[in-house]
Amino acid sequence: MKANKISGMIVNFDQSFFGEISFNEKIENIEEISNQESELFIIPGFVDLHCHGGGGFDTMQGKDAIKSMSEYHLNNGTTSLLATTWTSTFEKTHGALKDFNSLISENSNLLGVHLEGPFINPKKLGAQPALTQIPSEDFINEIIKEANVKTITLAPEIEGM
C-alpha cells in the first residue's frame, strides 16, 4: 500500500524543522527537507482532559450530541479527550455515563469520563448548578461501574470524603 505524505514545518517536542511525513494508519517515516518554506505546521494532536462539549453540543445531551462533539474535536485538532459531566441529578448523570460507556468503543478519541461534580463544595459552585451531593460508597461504585471514569473532581473538605 502506498503511503500518504504531508509536508510542512514539523513541530515535535523540543525541535522544529521543515520536512515530510509518510504515513498509512501510523507514521512510517519523518524526513527533514532543507531549504524549504511552508505556511503549514504539523504538530501533535491535542489531548483535552476536561471537555464539556464542542461544536454546539454538550456531553450531557445524549448519544447523538456526544458523537457530534467527538467528530467536531477530531476535525479541529483534538485527537483525544475525557468527556466531562457537570453537576446534575443522579438520573441525568447516570444516563450520560451510560451514553459515554456505549460510545467509547466506537469513538477512538473518547478516552473515558471526567466526572465533574456532584461531589463539589456547595459554597463554591462556580458555574455549576446547585445539585451537589454527599458521596456514598454505593453511589461512587455505581458510577465507576457504569462508565470508564478516569477522573473525578471532588472537594476533599466536604462530608463523606
Where are the language model's segments positioned?
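Divalent metal-dependent hydrolysis catalytic cores, especially in the metallo-beta-lactamase
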Residues: H52, K67-A96, S108-N121, E146-M161
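Short, conserved beta-strand segments within well-ordered enzyme catalytic domains
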Residues: S22, F46-D48, D58, L82-T84, ...
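Alpha-helical scaffolding segments of alpha/beta enzyme cores, especially the outer helices
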Residues: S68, G95-S102, D138-E142
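Short secondary-structure boundary/capping elements
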Residues: Q61-A65, T132-D138, A155-G160
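Conserved phosphate-binding/catalytic loop of the ribokinase/pfkB sugar-kinase fold
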Residues: N121-E146
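Short amphipathic alpha-helices and their capping/turn segments at secondary-structure boundaries
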Residues: E31-E39, H94-N107
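N-terminal metal-binding scaffold of metallo-dependent hydrolase/deaminase domains
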Residues: M1-N35
